[in-house]
């Protein structure tokens, strides 16, 4: 799977994230792709002209093994075009909040996080969402739920790596189309059968996408794409 970002300049944004994460940028049929792996979520950047409407519903958490590494990551990101971002964090909090060149928020987490230990550089995709949607995505992806407490949930590949987490209530009001979305690729089996499976789990079919696949919404109303392999 990959996380898709709408971008005014997909190549520029992919180049930024490729250098921050140490990944090669590939030209995908839909945009610029930073391929993932069995343990790291991929990132896909596509052309989109939608301006941000309200608070961001997803953001990335990058991990650090030492304070020096955290400082190097922050310095490198700033040099590549990131900017400090004030989201109300307190001065004594250890993580650093930045915005990428197109304003997408991300955090560079301080060392010592037990929750993100062993998760790799892209440690977490933090999402706004309910407990139910966390369980939906666990079943949809075939990933176990590794955190389920106080309405917060997280899932993780059986191979480990990046966690996808949902913060529970109160939820941020939705406004327009999400600029970050999940992109799933069907590598085997029938597209129609997979759509029926996801619908049985709680997804809603939104539309067909010519030469690509279909767009659905999860139980919280977040759009995602199921593409033919």
What is each residue range found by the language model?
Residues 1-29, 34-86, 99-150, 155-207, ...:
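Glyoxalase I/VOC metalloenzyme domain signal
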Residues 91-93, 209-211:
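Short, small/polar residue-rich loop motifs at catalytic or cofactor-binding pockets
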């Amino acid at each position: 799977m990959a996380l898709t970002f709408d971008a005014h300049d997909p190549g520029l944004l992919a180049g930024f994230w490729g250098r921050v994460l140490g990944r090669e940028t590939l030209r995908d049929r839909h945009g610029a792709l930073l391929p993932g792996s069995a343990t790291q979520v991929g990132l896909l950047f596509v052309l989109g002209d939608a301006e941000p409407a309200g608070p961001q519903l997803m953001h990335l958490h990058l991990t650090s093994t030492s304070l020096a590494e955290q400082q190097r990551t922050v310095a490198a990101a700033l040099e590549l075009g990131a900017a400090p971002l004030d989201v109300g964090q307190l001065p004594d909090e250890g993580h650093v909040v930045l915005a990428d060149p197109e304003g997408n928020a991300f955090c560079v987490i301080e060392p010592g996080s037990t929750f993100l230990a062993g998760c790799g550089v892209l440690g977490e995709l933090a999402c706004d969402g309910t407990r139910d949607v966390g369980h939906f995505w666990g079943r949809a992806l075939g990933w176990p739920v590794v955190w389920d407490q106080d309405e917060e949930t997280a899932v993780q590949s059986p191979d480990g790596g990046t966690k996808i987490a949902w913060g529970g209530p109160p939820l941020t009001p939705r406004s327009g189309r999400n600029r970050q979305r999940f992109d799933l690729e069907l590598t085997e089996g029938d597209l129609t059968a997979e759509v029926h499976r996801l619908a049985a789990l709680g997804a809603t079919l939104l539309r067909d996408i010519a030469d690509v696949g279909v767009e659905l919404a999860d139980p919280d109303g977040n759009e995602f794409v199921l593409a033919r392999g």
